UniProtKB/Swiss-Prot annotation:
Its EC number is 2.7.8.41. Its cofactor is Mn(2+). The lineage of its organism: Eukaryota, Viridiplantae, Streptophyta, Embryophyta, Tracheophyta. This is Cardiolipin synthase (CMP-forming). Residues 328-341 are mitochondrial intermembrane. Belongs to the CDP-alcohol phosphatidyltransferase class-I family. InterPro entries: CDP-alcohol_PTase-I, CDP-OH_P_trans, CDP-OH_PTrfase_TM_dom, CDP_ALCOHOL_P_TRANSF_CS. Its main location: mitochondrion.
Length: 341
């Protein structure tokens, strides 16, 4: 009994000496204090056996694994620090900012699911206007680019009259202005950010009327070969007829007005997009017509040879353009035609 009392006094003395050390260790362990469970989940039997003597053996000096239960080992050796949700909020805000930038640059529709974490409701009336290719998709006919295209269309019959009356110099100047307007209407539309559905039909139609009128008048004056003019006119008629036929098949031959036929006032109007080979062909045709107009007043046998070469070039690009549109038509043919075939 005397030995037990002496050991107990020795333990109490050591406990007083080591109390500041354990207090400091516990304070530096973290800002959150955890209350250990009554029994250790990993060693329940071991904790139950030592529980009567734990108040005497825990504060002893020496290694921690000999004097502390498992949960106190974790608190003393590995401090716990709870991280706040500030970093998570910052990541969410950064994600929203990136998604907004992506939508503003690429104009992705919200139906694709690229929406921010915090909902942002934006309602757009699709029947009023639609933004495409950097400009407003407008249905109105009255605008500057369409007026330029209309002036080029009207210039075709005027140039026909000039060539028929052998006013070649005046016809050349008029053709130069009309040819420049083919570039000008597109430039003005881009500068004014006008994306007109009617203009997409009017621009190629004006080119065909201009070239057709001038070519027919030049055949009458023996300035161009009739075979070449026939190829050009047949190609234009085939393109216009094929486009109308394809549109009618898509509508199942049912429409009320021409506005419905061309879908000018629908939610997704169909524009006419010319191929690159067609634009190149138009440039070669205008160059040939301009050179042939000047041939009677300023030409010679050498220039006539160059006009012959250019005529063959125009015939080649005309047939190549026709073939390219045929391939495009075959790829975009209606589903009803695919089922029939």
């Amino acid at each position: 009994m005397a030995i037990y009392r002496s050991l107990r006094k020795l333990v109490e003395i050591n406990h007083r000496k080591t109390r500041p050390f354990f207090t400091a260790a516990t304070a530096s362990g973290g800002t959150v204090s955890l209350t250990p469970p009554q029994f250790s989940p990993l060693f329940p039997h071991f904790s139950h056996r030592l529980s009567p003597l734990s108040k005497w053996f825990v504060p002893l000096n020496g290694p921690l694994f000999l004097s502390s239960p498992p949960w106190k080992l974790l608190q003393s050796a590995t401090p716990l620090h709870w991280r706040g949700n500030g970093s998570v909020l910052k990541k969410v805000e950064a994600l929203n900012l990136r998604l907004d930038r992506i939508r503003s640059r690429t104009r992705f529709p919200r139906q694709l699911g690229l929406q921010s974490v915090v909902p942002n409701i934006l309602t757009v009336d699709r029947n009023d206007s639609k933004e495409e290719d950097g400009g407003k998709l407008v249905k109105s006919f009255v605008n500057v680019p369409n007026m330029i295209s209309m002036a080029r269309l009207v210039s075709g019959p005027v140039l026909w009259w000039m060539i028929s009356n052998e006013m070649y110099s005046s016809a050349f100047l008029g053709l130069a202005v009309s040819g420049a307007s083919d570039w000008l209407d597109g430039y003005v539309a881009r500068r004014m950010k006008i994306n007109s559905v009617v203009g997409s039909y009017l621009d190629p139609l004006a080119d065909k009327v201009l070239i057709g009128c001038v070519a027919v008048a030049m055949v009458q004056k023996d300035l161009l070969h009739p075979g070449l003019v026939g190829i050009v006119l047949l190609r234009d008629v085939a393109l216009v007829g094929g486009a109308v036929y394809l549109r009618a098949l898509n509508l199942d031959w049912k429409w009320k007005t021409w506005s419905d036929f061309f879908n000018l006032d629908g939610s997704s109007p169909q524009k006419v997009e010319p191929l690159f080979i067609s634009k190149v062909n138009t440039v070669f045709q205008l160059t040939l017509v301009a050179g042939a107009i000047l041939q009677p007043e300023f030409g010679n046998p050498d220039t006539q040879t160059w006009i012959t070469y250019l005529s063959w070039l125009v015939a080649s690009t005309t047939m190549a353009s026709t073939a390219a549109y045929g391939v495009q038509y075959w790829k975009k043919r209606p589903i009803s035609m695919i089922k029939r075939s």
